[in-house]
């Protein structure tokens, strides 16, 4: 039986996956720029996080739980990488465009231990950490492996990188009165708070509830709304140009016809 608390990550996975596939399909069909493609990939990373979280909440053994904890970390790294790529191109951050390969290198080095290495320095599967969460009147128990020092460093590095993303977004909207209503500004700050909360909870620093999947859902929804306006605007502009070109072609043909008739007179 599926635990009640896994409903939220299942919803997150479904919505994010559908949006990611739709945006990528639309991008490839219309050859829309890589901003949309990178966000589509970020949405698929959120889908992977939702799937791994739902499975973690329903794990019956510590070994099984650890597998999905690793998937969670990998999906978060992939999300941060693709979302950072999206932000630097959306805001046109020239410096980070040039040195984005550094982010790719760090991401690959961070992913490798969680995929290939079984060691207490990564995850200590001999120790467990229990979280009791009350969800709609039902007490849920989440059993997890204790993160090793390398994983703790990964958590810290992830928070630092996303803090950098958040700072760049805040700087871009500095002085704008309507910044709190802008989807990019609002969603990035919400997710940063959720990421810090979950990282501190995963390290055992605070006793809270995991809210990262909710933060992911809000970000995906808000940024998808932002991109939908941009995409529809681009499509409308393209259609307007096509109509204008058609009108010019008709005018050209009429002008050529008039000139021809006068030369024959």
Task: Say what each PLM segment does.
Residues 1-3, 21-34:
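Short, hydrophobic transmembrane alpha-helix segments
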């Amino acid at each position: 039986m599926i635990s009640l608390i896994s409903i939220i990550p299942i919803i997150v996975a479904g919505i994010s996956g559908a949006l990611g596939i739709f945006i990528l399909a639309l991008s490839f069909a219309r050859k829309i720029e890589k901003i949309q493609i990178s966000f589509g990939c970020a949405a698929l990373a959120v889908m992977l996080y939702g799937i791994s979280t739902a499975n973690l909440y329903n794990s019956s053994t510590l070994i099984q739980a650890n597998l999905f904890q690793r998937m969670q970390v990998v999906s978060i790294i992939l999300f941060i990488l693709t979302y950072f790529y999206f932000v630097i191109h959306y805001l046109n951050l020239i410096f980070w465009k040039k040195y984005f390969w550094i982010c790719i290198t760090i991401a690959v080095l961070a992913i490798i231990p969680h995929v290939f290495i079984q060691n207490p320095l990564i995850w200590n599967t001999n120790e467990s950490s229990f979280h009791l969460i009350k969800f709609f009147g039902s007490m849920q128990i989440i059993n997890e492996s204790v993160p090793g020092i390398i994983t703790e460093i990964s958590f810290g590095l992830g928070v630092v990188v996303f803090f950098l993303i958040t700072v760049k977004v805040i700087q871009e909207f500095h002085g704008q009165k309507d910044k709190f209503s802008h989807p990019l500004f609002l969603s990035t700050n919400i997710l940063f708070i959720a990421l810090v909360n979950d990282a501190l909870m995963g390290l055992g620093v605070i006793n809270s509830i995991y809210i990262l999947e909710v933060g992911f859902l809000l970000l995906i929804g808000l940024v998808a709304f932002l991109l939908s306006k941009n995409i529809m605007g681009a499509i409308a502009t393209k259609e307007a140009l096509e109509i204008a070109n058609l009108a010019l072609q008709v005018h050209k043909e009429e002008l050529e016809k008039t000139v021809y008739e006068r030369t024959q007179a």
